Each structure stands twice: as C-alpha cells, then as structure tokens.
Regions:
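Acidic, Ser/Thr/Pro/Gly-enriched interdomain connector segments
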Residues: 1-27
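Short, well-ordered surface patches within globular domains
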Residues: 33-34, 56
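Short capping motifs at secondary-structure boundaries
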Residues: 21, 42-45
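Catalytic phosphate/metal-binding cores of nucleic-acid and nucleotide-processing enzymes, i.e., regions
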Residues: 8, 12, 46-48, 56
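Intrinsically disordered, low-complexity Ser/Thr-rich linker and spacer segments
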Residues: 1, 58-59
Length: 59
C-alpha cells in the first residue's frame, strides 16, 4: 500500500481526492492535507495528514 503525504502526485492522490469529495488535480498540497486531517479526526484516527494503511482502509 502506498503512503501519501503533502508533495506526492499522481493517480493515487486523485483517488484520495475523489474519495474526500474535493477538487481532483492529482497534487497532494495543503488543501488535500487539510481535508485528510479533517477526515482522520472525524474517523477517530491520528490526524497527521498522512494517508497510510489505516486511512486507506477507512476510505
């Protein structure tokens, strides 16, 4: 499983953005990180803005 964080780009980032319901551009920038953190908080995960195995599973 791919770990994604700010600065990453590509199709996996697009998948995350689509799942979060935000604009899809394939760039994991500050906006994507913000929404990842919000998602993680809402799901009771550690809100670090990094999409690792636990966040992938929840998405």
């Amino acid at each position: 499983m791919v770990v994604l964080y700010q600065g990453c780009t590509g199709d996996n980032v697009r998948v995350i953005q689509e799942a979060l319901g935000i604009d899809v551009d394939g760039i994991f920038g500050p906006i994507t990180e913000h929404f990842v953190k919000e998602y993680q908080k809402n799901k009771g995960l550690w809100a670090d803005g990094i999409v690792g195995p636990k966040t992938w599973t929840m998405l």
